[in-house]
Amino acid sequence: VQSVSNFILLDHLEDVMNPRNLSMTLIFGAALFISLFLLIGKLLSKLSEKNQLFLTAGIAILGVIIQYFLLIHIQAVLRYDHLRVFDGGLEILNTGHLSLTANDGYYGLYPFNISIAVFNSIILRIVKLFRIAEKYYLLSLQCVYLFLIDLGVFFSWKIVRILYSIKHATLFTLLAVTNPMLYVCAMGCYTTTLMLPLLMGTMFLFILFLKEQDFRKKLLWG
């Protein structure tokens, strides 16, 4: 029975992945998704700003819970650059230095990843101070990177709220929570996740700088 059901499923997936069917599926899905968000936008207009803030907080908390639940239970294995910079962090933690010739001269070829390995070693050193078992080092590091992702999303939410409205910011939160990449990227420990809060935080401060009328506060944001 299992073999028959798998065969039927694969046969159905082949039909869906047909270029013509796939295009129609994507168009239909996008139209449905946009229509749904327009409807939600109209419903949000009927809520007060305070209620929209509560709704945003609820959506965000739900998204964070799902992120950490998946991170803890899936326990994804790092590969390629993600694995190299994690191993580099461990090497610095255990030996105090980083070899530029080990692993086929990885850090000699990609010296810009040295800073990521150093950052990882700092986080791992803090984890070690709390006497967390070594088998949880990777998970602990992933939790920190996941926090950085969510911090970047928070700065993005602040930007949308400043430039547009609380309704648009709430829609942005819903869009972020329903974006699969928010959960896929949570497993990685690399440049994209590390730089996200720095990039969005810088943009947030720059927007505050442009909108601020008080010169002394401009200096603070600048």
Task: List each model region and its residues.
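Start-transfer (signal-anchor) and selected internal transmembrane alpha helices
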Residues: 1-68
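Hydrophobic core segments of transmembrane alpha-helices in multi-pass, intramembrane catalytic enzymes
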Residues: 28-32, 85-87, 91, 149-153, ...
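Transmembrane-helix motifs of polytopic, lipid-linked glycan transferases
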Residues: 41, 140-163, 201
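Short helix- or helix-capping micro-motifs
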Residues: 63, 172-180
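Short hydrophobic/aromatic helix or loop-helix immediately within or flanking a transmembrane segment
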Residues: 87-88, 105-136, 146-147
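Transmembrane alpha-helix boundary and packing residues in multipass membrane permease domains
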Residues: 117, 121, 154-158, 204
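Membrane-interface transmembrane helices that cradle and orient dolichyl/undecaprenyl
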Residues: 163-164, 202-219
